[in-house]
Amino acid sequence: MKKLEQLYEGKAKKVYKTDVEDVLIVDYKDDATAFNGEKRGTIVGKGVINNRMSNYIMKQLEKEGVPTHYIEELSDRETAVKKVQIVPLEVIIRNVSAGSFAKKLGIEEGRKLLCPTLEFSYKDDSLGDPMINSSYAKALGLATQEEIDTISTYAYKVNEVMIKYFEGIGIELIDFKIEFGRYHDQIILADEISPDTCRLWDIKTHEKLDKDRFRRDLGNVEDAYLEVFKRLGIE
């Protein structure tokens, strides 16, 4: 497989065309952003950790029946993925009160929720990725009811699998954001799963091991990402 021209560069990744139909190459960067790009910086080694961690988790999810865009890890930073049409919805699952959820509802951070919550946000940085419901998504033509049902089912399954997996390495899955795409009329998990897209706390100390360390200027960002990577035991 040959890497061809760059198709897109986002906040955390570059995407390249290949000489294979319906296959792209994703190149993970060390760039870090927060608050819809208002805060910018660099987390040394983040690209390697996010690439390898995301691939590792997606392979586990495939075993549990969640289809993903993952094809093959090409290098520490590059992965071959299926070319999908991204559904313009960010899907957020929350298990514990944190971040904007806690602030918006006036709930203390760290409060265990009685059940996981599912949110949709409209993917548009210029609007601040506003929260919408399934009726909005259908009315705007972002997704059909069948697609929304499939996305919701997969999102809860991802949560179920990851909660157990992270608990096994002493990490609590607070919340996470995922994205889905259309691939030959099938809905599959796309984008990434990493400390950029998940809130991960040490179960015993509640130390934050995710991008909140960058957002909130807590320091030791690289160490936190590396700690998650090491606990996963990725070789």
UniProtKB/Swiss-Prot annotation:
Gene Ontology BP annotations: 'de novo' IMP biosynthetic process; cobalamin biosynthetic process
Listed EC numbers: 6.3.2.6
Record's catalysed reaction(s): 5-amino-1-(5-phospho-D-ribosyl)imidazole-4-carboxylate + L-aspartate + ATP = (2S)-2-[5-amino-1-(5-phospho-beta-D-ribosyl)imidazole-4-carboxamido]succinate + ADP + phosphate + 2 H(+)
Pathway: Purine metabolism; IMP biosynthesis via de novo pathway; 5-amino-1-(5-phospho-D-ribosyl)imidazole-4-carboxamide from 5-amino-1-(5-phospho-D-ribosyl)imidazole-4-carboxylate: step 1/2
Classification via InterPro entries: SAICAR_synt/ADE2_N, SAICAR_synt_PurC, SAICAR_synth, SAICAR_synthetase, SAICAR_synthetase_CS
GO terms of molecular function: ATP binding; phosphoribosylaminoimidazolesuccinocarboxamide synthase activity
UniProt keyword annotations, A-Z: ATP-binding, Ligase, Nucleotide-binding, Purine biosynthesis
UniProt similarity note: Belongs to the SAICAR synthetase family.
HAMAP family documented for this protein: SAICAR_synth (MF_00137)
Protein name: Phosphoribosylaminoimidazole-succinocarboxamide synthase
Provenance organism: Lachnoclostridium phytofermentans (strain ATCC 700394 / DSM 18823 / ISDg) (Clostridium phytofermentans)
Protein's gene: purC
